[in-house]
């Protein structure tokens, strides 16, 4: 009997949406959006992250001034309890993703284990 992996993937998606980790991200992000200062800082930080990623993908160097700005943003973010809570929730979800990924690739790892 053939297994439809996409059905299982869709079930996993639904389970993730119902998880405590996902709910924590939703709740933390709602707090960020409710506080305009937190929201502005978070949006600015995300723009900086995207800019850095684009530059890295294009092989461009990140300038000293840009690094300084990013460090200043990171310091502000550490001092913002709403964003800190969101980032902690994201880290928890990232850990779940890593553990799920290990489970998913286990069959391939077993093939190549010898």
Curated annotation (Swiss-Prot):
<dbReference type="InterPro" id="IPR010368">
    <property type="entry name" value="Com_YlbF"/>
</dbReference>
<dbReference type="InterPro" id="IPR023378">
    <property type="entry name" value="YheA/YmcA-like_dom_sf"/>
</dbReference>
<protein>
    <recommendedName>
        <fullName>UPF0342 protein SSP0954</fullName>
    </recommendedName>
</protein>
<comment type="similarity">
    <text>Belongs to the UPF0342 family.</text>
</comment>
<dbReference type="Pfam" id="PF06133">
    <property type="entry name" value="Com_YlbF"/>
</dbReference>
